[in-house]
Amino acid sequence: MTVVREELELKARVENPDAVRKAILAAGAELMYRGAMMDRRFDRRGRLEQRDEVVRLRVYHPADKSPEWGVLGWKGPVQRRGEYRLREEWESRVDDPKAVLVILRHMGYKISLRVDRAVEQYRLGGATLRLEWYPAMDVLLEVEGQPEAIEGAVRATGLPRDAFLAESLPYFTAAYEERTGRVARVSRLKRRE
């Protein structure tokens, strides 16, 4: 039987990531990953964007210098479920992300968006929490899981509940630019690959 995977999440701007890290570790969170996380979104002539769908190759570069790996995924249109951002999501781990990149390019896909960040990913109960540091933008915290697990993780952070929004990265980059007057950068690269 095939089960549709639903991604429910919230994001928050974090002023003091050290305090959040300390709070979630004190609540029993377990560090699952630390290192670089590089996302490449693909499209063909804007067709996926028109349908609010995403094809993404995410590449993990662990801080401990162990071998990189990737995750190829598809995400359906954004929806809302109560206070949460919801998308259907299908992913598969890949051992050779460079080969996947070549395959996608040969299929006519081009990179439409790059997102590079250093991350720390934790597991707390049934929730995944990820602190994200971008090249030139606010630190963000993403919390993903089922509603009860998300709310428990949010409480563990010590941040106010109203800091967590059902918004995506463009919302936070625009808020950063409006608040600081500086251009946000979410990729290390300034040119097309």
Spell out what each predicted region is.
Residues 1-128, 163-193:
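N-terminal strand-loop-strand beta-hairpin
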Residues 132-137:
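A contiguous pocket-lining binding segment that forms or flanks enzyme active sites
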Residues 151-164:
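Long, well-ordered alpha-helical scaffolding segments within enzyme catalytic domains
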